Amino acid sequence: MLDDRSAIEHHKYSQRLTELERRSAAAQQRQQKKKPPKMHVGNKIRGIKIKRYVSNGERVLKLVVLFSAILLFMLYIISPLSKITTLHVTGNHDLTKEQVEKNANIYPGRFIWGVYLARHQLTKQAIRKNPQIKDLRIKVTGPQSLQISVKENALLGIAVMNNDTYAVLADGQLQRTKNADNGIAYKRFDGHKKVLATTAAQLGKLKLAIRNGISSVSYQPTKEYPDRVIIYMRDGNTVYGDLNTIGDKMGYYPAIAASMKNKGIIDLQVGAYSYDYGSKDK
């Protein structure tokens, strides 16, 4: 009887043990499905080596491309392909293209990047050589083409002093010249260079339309008006003015001239008024 009972209990224990083993195996299978299989250490090392190799290869390629580009650019700089073949000059009115090129020392055949890198020095050099050049802008417009934009000190006219002929510029500078150009004729300024420079700087403020209407300017001081200049207009009128203020007051000339019925004198020395020739002795 005892043997039968012991056999039954042993059988039940074996069944429970089998059931537990089955559940444990099933749980392990589920967990293995959730987690990816572990990579072998050797495979990991191989993968790291491959990544490093690819990364190093990319770095080397980038360096090769960079140094190749630098080398090609350096070869281009010293090759005939970087020499100026086309040169454009813009903004010049009184100056010729050749004068601008000569004063700036820029010409076809020079290395374009050498010119560009030295553009500030070349600009200063041009201004120093020729007062008619107020400013320069140098711009690379192509592999072999360059543009020079010039800003001029306008040429107002010519003055003859002590047998020397001077070009009178809009900023008041005087430039000795051999060419008697058209423009405003400056008279009776002998021995008065500073007065001429001040007068020129004042007239340089005027709009081009007014300035082009001036035929000549004469320095004629009096006791009452020691800074008097007389301006003879191309339309037949005469303007009396102060050489220190004439640049501002001449701005009223078009309106005053339009209101006059006859040709006459416009006095801008003190205030602003006009009268016909012969109607008032001044």
UniProtKB/Swiss-Prot annotation:
Residues 19-41 are annotated as: Disordered. InterPro entries: DivIB, FtsQ_DivIB, POTRA, POTRA_FtsQ_type. Its main location: membrane. Residues 31-41 have a biased composition (Basic residues). It is a single-pass type II membrane protein. Keywords: Cell cycle, Cell division, Cell membrane, Membrane, Transmembrane, Transmembrane helix. Signal peptide: none annotated. Residues 82-153 form the POTRA domain. Residues 81-282 are extracellular. This is Cell division protein DivIB. It comes from Limosilactobacillus reuteri (strain ATCC 55730 / SD2112). The gene is divIB.
